[in-house]
From Swiss-Prot:
The keyword Nucleotide-binding applies. Ribonucleoside-diphosphate reductase holoenzyme provides the precursors necessary for viral DNA synthesis. Allows virus growth in non-dividing cells, as well as reactivation from latency in infected hosts. Catalyzes the biosynthesis of deoxyribonucleotides from the corresponding ribonucleotides. It catalyses: a 2'-deoxyribonucleoside 5'-diphosphate + [thioredoxin]-disulfide + H2O = a ribonucleoside 5'-diphosphate + [thioredoxin]-dithiol. This is Ribonucleoside-diphosphate reductase large subunit. It comes from Equine herpesvirus 1 (strain Ab4p) (EHV-1).
C-alpha cells in the first residue's frame, strides 16, 4: 500500500503550488541555492523528497530572511497535502485514525455540508495557516495530524473536522449548550460552523490531548490529573501507583501527586525512606515515555517540613549522590506554607538563629491545615520536641534554590494562597495538598476522587482588530472578540469533557462532580508587540488585567447561563462561596473592575441559578500549542528573538517574525539590514545587547526578551491579573547570570519573597537561567548555574 500511494502521480495542483513557491524563493534572490528541480510528471514520493531538500537547504537562511521562513512553512504544508487522501471516506474508515462511531455517523449524516465547508476552508483559513511559518507547519505535520498506513496523513481540514464534529455532537445533546454557543437558530450545521471557524481560525486552541485524540477511540482528552492518595507506606503507595497513576500515565495524562504523608524517615528496615518510592515512580515514567509517543510526566508534591526533604531536593542531575536515588524523569514541587517565608523574612530583617524544623509522620496532620491553624500546630509540635531535625532557615532556602537552578526542580507554590482563594471553605474539608504537573491547576483531591482539568487557550493575536493595509487605522484589542472566544471555549471544553473517557473511576468522579475548566491564553507578548506596546508599559499592564477579567467574566457568564437554561449546577454548589454571591476576585483587596455592572448582574444570576462549572481560568504554559500559532508562549515574554535547537532530525529555527519585519522596514537597504542582523546575531539576538538602550518609542525598543525584563515587573503583572485567575499561573523566572558566572541564591529568593508578598499561588514554575559562561561551579554561599533550560 505504501508503494502504491506514494508512487502514484502527484496531483497537478500541488505541483503547480510547489513551483509557485520555488519561484518566490528565486525572486527573493536564492535561485542559486536551488540545485535540484522537479522531474516531469513526478510521483508523490518525488515531490516529498524535493520539498524536503528545498526546506533543508533554505532553513539556515531563515536566520536572516523571514520571507524564507514563511515560504518554507508553505512548502511543508504542500508536503502535508502530498500525503493527504482526497477521499474523505478513506479517512473515515481508517483503522489508524480510529474515529469514534458517533463522530463518523455525524459526518456521514452531514456529508454535503461538511464537504462544502472543507472546500471553503481550503481557499480561506488554510491559506492563512500556511503563511504562519515553518515551525507551525512542522508541528502540525510531526505531532498533531494523525498518521495512516502507506505514508498517508490526515489533512488540516480533516483535523479540524474531527475536533469540531466531536464538540458539536456533545453540544447538541444539551439544548442549553447550543443556545449559549450560537444566537438565533440552533441546529447541527450552525453549531459545527461556530466550532470549525474558531478552530480553523486559530482563535480557540485546544490542549494537546484534545488535538491528538479528539474524535478518536484512543487516548484521554484531559490534560491534568491531581492525585492525593492516602499513601503512608510502600504497600499503600504500590496500590495507588497501580490503580491510579499507572493508567493515567499510560493515557498520556500529566500527574501532580501529593506524597507528603509518606513521611517515614530512613531507619532500620526502611533504609531509603520515600526515595525508594520516588525511584519507582521515576522508572515507571521513563518506561511509559520510551515508546516515542507524546511524553508525559509526574510532579511530586511535598511540604518543606518533610523529614526527607533534603534527599528529595537532591534527587536530580548532578545533585544525586548515585544512580539508586537519581530521579531525572520526575519533578518535585515545594508546597510551601506562609510560615516558611515569614521565618525567612525574619532572617532578612536581621534576626539570628531563625530555624526551620523537619517532622516525620507524627506530624502528618499538618497536611490538612493551612493559615493560622497550621502555624499554631507547627509551633506547638516544635515546642513539644517532635521535630526530627532543625535547619537554619537560610540554609533551607539555599537548598531549595540550588536544586531549582541546577536541576530545574523543585517548582514552588504557596499553600496558603491556594487554599485561601479556593471556592470552598476548606477548613471543613481539609486543605488542598498539591497541584498538577505544571503548577496552574488548583483542585481539592482526596482518596475518593482525583482532580481533573480539561484545558484550552485563547490565541490573543486573533482578538486584535487589524485595519486593512495602507489605511490610517491602528490595531486595537477587541474585547468583544475575546468575550466571544471565551464563551465558545467554555462550551467547547464542556463538550470535550462530556466526550472524554477517563482512565480511572476516581478521575471520572472528579470530572462529574467538579466540571473544572482551565481556560488560558497564549500570545500575550505577541499581541502587545502587534499593538506596538512594550510588555512592561503602563498601557500593556492595564490591558493585561482587562484581558484576564474579560476571560473570567465571559466564561462564568456562559456557565451561569447554562444553569439559567435548565442545566444543574456542579455538585456542591450550595456549599460553595459562589452560592453566597462571592466571586473569585472578592478574596483579593483593592480590586478595580473594568466591567462592574456586568459583574453585578452576573453575581445575582449565579446566586439565583448556580454555576455549571466550579472553575474557569488557569494560565497554563502553552509550549506545544503555541508553536502551531507562531505566538508567544502563554503569558510569558519570548525567551529569545531567535529560537534555535539542534535535534536528531536537524536544527529547529523560529525567528521573531515581528522583529524581522520591523528590521526590514527600518533598514530598507539590504546591506544595512544584513548588518543589523549580524549585529543581533553577535549579541545572541538581544536588541538591547546589539543596539543599546533605545529611546522609548523607537520601533525596536519593545523587542525585549524575558531575561531582559525586571522579574519583579513580571511578577507584578501576574499579581495584577491574579484576582481573575481562579486557579493559578505557571509563572517561570528568567534569570541572567552575572558576568563572573556567580549567581547568589539570595537573588532568586528575593524574587520568591516578592511573589509571596504579592499573594501569588505559584511562586516559581521553572527557573530558567541564561548563562554567562559554560564553567559553572558551586562555591560557598553562591549559586552558579550549571544548566540552561531554554
Amino acid at each position: 500500500m505504501a508503494l502504491n500511494f506514494l508512487q502514484s502521480d502527484c496531483p497537478l495542483a500541488i505541483i503547480q503550488d510547489v513551483i509557485s513557491r520555488v519561484d518566490a524563493i528565486s525572486d527573493y534572490g536564492y535561485a542559486n541555492e536551488l540545485s535540484t528541480t522537479l522531474p516531469p510528471r513526478p510521483s508523490r514520493s518525488q515531490v516529498l523528497e524535493y520539498i524536503t531538500r528545498v526546506v533543508d537547504t533554505l532553513k539556515p537562511r531563515c536566520r536572516v530572511d523571514e520571507r524564507l521562513y514563511v515560504v518554507c512553512g508553505e512548502l511543508v504544508h504542500l508536503r502535508i497535502r502530498t500525503r493527504n487522501v482526497e477521499d474523505l471516506k478513506y479517512w473515515l474508515n481508517s483503522t489508524e485514525i480510529a474515529l469514534n462511531e458517533i463522530v463518523e455517523k455525524d459526518i456521514l449524516d452531514h456529508l454535503d455540508f461538511i464537504q462544502r465547508t472543507l472546500h471553503a476552508f481550503e481557499s480561506s483559513e488554510y491559506r492563512e495557516l500556511c503563511a504562519l511559518g515553518l515551525q507551525s507547519a512542522l508541528k502540525y505535520e510531526e505531532m498533531y495530524l494523525a498518521k495512516m498506513r502507506g505514508g498517508r496523513i490526515e489533512s488540516m481540514g480533516q483535523f479540524f473536522l474531527r475536533l469540531a464534529t466531536t464538540a458539536t455532537h456533545y453540544t447538541m445533546e444539551e439544548p442549553a449548550m447550543a443556545r449559549v454557543l450560537v444566537s438565533g437558530e440552533v441546529g447541527w450545521t450552525y453549531i459545527f460552523k461556530a466550532y470549525f471557524t474558531a478552530l480553523a481560525g486559530q482563535v480557540l486552541i485546544p490542549a494537546t490531548p484534545i488535538m491528538l485524540f479528539g474524535g478518536r477511540d484512543c487516548g484521554s482528552l484531559a490534560s491534568c490529573y491531581l492525585l492525593n492518595p492516602r499513601v503512608t507506606d510502600m504497600n499503600s503507595a504500590m496500590l495507588a501507583l497501580m490503580e491510579e497513576a499507572g493508567p493515567i500515565l499510560c493515557n498520556r495524562g500529566g500527574i501532580g501527586l501529593s506524597l507528603q504523608r509518606f513521611n517515614t524517615p530512613p531507619k532500620e528496615g526502611c533504609s531509603r525512606g520515600v526515595m525508594a518510592l520516588l525511584k519507582l515512580i521515576d522508572s515507571m515514567t521513563m518506561a511509559i515515555n520510551s515508546d516515542g509517543e507524546r511524553p508525559t510526566g509526574v510532579c511530586v508534591y511535598f511540604e518543606p517540613w518533610h523529614a526527607d526533604i533534603r534527599a528529595i531536593l537532591n534527587m536530580r542531575g548532578m545533585l544525586a549522590r548515585d544512580e539508586t536515588v537519581r530521579c531525572d524523569n520526575i519533578f518535585a514541587c515545594m508546597w510551601t506554607p506562609d510560615l516558611f517565608f515569614d521565618r525567612y523574612q525574619r532572617y532578612l530583617d536581621g534576626e539570628s538563629g531563625v530555624m526551620w524544623t523537619l517532622f516525620d509522620d507524627t506530624a502528618s496532620h499538618l497536611c490538612h491545615m493551612y493559615g493560622k491553624e497550621f502555624e499554631e500546630e507547627y509551633e506547638r509540635l516544635e515546642q513539644c520536641g517532635f521535630g526530627v531535625d532543625s535547619i537554619p532557615i537560610q540554609d533551607m532556602a539555599f537548598i531549595i534554590v540550588r536544586s531549582a537552578v541546577m536541576t530545574g526542580s523543585p517548582f514552588l507554590m504557596f499553600k496558603d494562597a491556594c487554599n485561601k482563594h479556593y471556592h470552598f471553605d476548606l477548613r471543613r474539608k481539609g486543605a488542598i495538598m498539591g497541584s498538577n504537573l505544571c503548577t496552574e491547576i488548583i483542585q481539592h483531591a482526596d482518596e475518593t476522587q482525583n482532580g481533573v482539568c480539561n484545558l484550552a487557550s485563547i490565541n490573543l493575536p486573533k482578538c486584535l482588530a487589524i485595519p486593512p493595509p495602507h489605511t490610517a487605522g491602528v490595531p486595537y484589542f477587541d474585547f468583544a472578540a475575546l468575550g466571544r472566544a471565551a464563551a465558545t471555549a467554555t462550551i467547547f471544553v464542556n463538550s470535550m469533557m462530556r466526550a472524554g473517557t477517563y482512565p480511572t473511576v476516581k478521575s471520572q468522579r472528579g470530572v462529574d462532580e467538579n466540571r473544572s475548566l482551565g481556560l488560558g491564553i497564549q500570545g500575550l507578548h505577541t499581541a502587545f508587540l502587534m499593538l506596538d506596546l512594550d510588555m512592561a508599559s503602563p498601557e500593556a499592564r492595564q490591558l493585561n488585567k482587562q484581558i484576564a477579567e474579560r476571560l473570567l467574566l465571559n466564561s462564568m457568564k456562559a456557565s451561569a447561563t447554562l444553569c439559567r437554561l435548565g442545566m444543574k449546577p456542579f455538585k456542591g454548589f450550595e456549599d460553595s462561596k459562589y452560592s453566597l454571591g462571592e466571586l473569585p476576585f472578592d478574596s483579593y483587596p483593592g480590586v478595580t473592575l473594568a466591567n462592574r455592572n456586568a459583574w453585578r448582574r452576573l453575581r445575582t444570576e449565579i446566586k439565583q441559578h448556580g454555576l455549571y462549572n466550579s472553575q474557569f481560568v488557569a494560565y497554563m504554559p502553552t509550549v506545544s500549542s503555541s508553536q502551531v500559532t507562531e505566538s508567544s508562549e502563554g503569558f510569558s515574554p519570548v525567551y529569545t528573538n531567535l529560537f534555535s535547537k539542534v535535534t536528531a532530525t536537524g536544527e529547529v529555527l523560529r525567528p521573531n517574525l515581528l522583529l524581522m519585519r520591523t528590521i526590514r522596514s527600518i533598514f530598507p537597504r539590504e546591506c544595512a539590514r544584513l548588518q543589523a542582523l549580524s549585529t543581533l546575531e553577535m549579541a545572541q539576538w538581544s536588541v538591547v545587547g546589539a543596539f543599546g538602550d533605545l529611546p522609548v518609542g523607537h520601533p525596536l525598543s519593545k523587542f525585549k526578551t524575558a531575561f531582559e525584563y525586571d522579574q519583579r515587573t513580571l511578577i507584578d503583572m501576574c499579581a495584577d491579573r491574579a484576582p481573575f485567575v481562579d486557579q493559578s499561573q505557571s509563572m517561570s523566572l528568567f534569570i541572567t547570570e552575572p558576568a563572573d558566572g556567580k549567581l547568589p541564591a539570595s537573588k532568586i529568593m528575593s524574587l520568591l519573597v516578592h511573589a509571596y508578598k504579592r499573594g501569588l499561588k505559584t511562586g516559581m514554575y521553572y527557573c530558567k537561567i541564561k548563562k554567562a559562561t559554560n564553567n559553572g561551579v558551586f562555591v560557598g554561599g553562591d549559586l552558579v548555574c550549571t544548566s540552561c533550560s531554554l
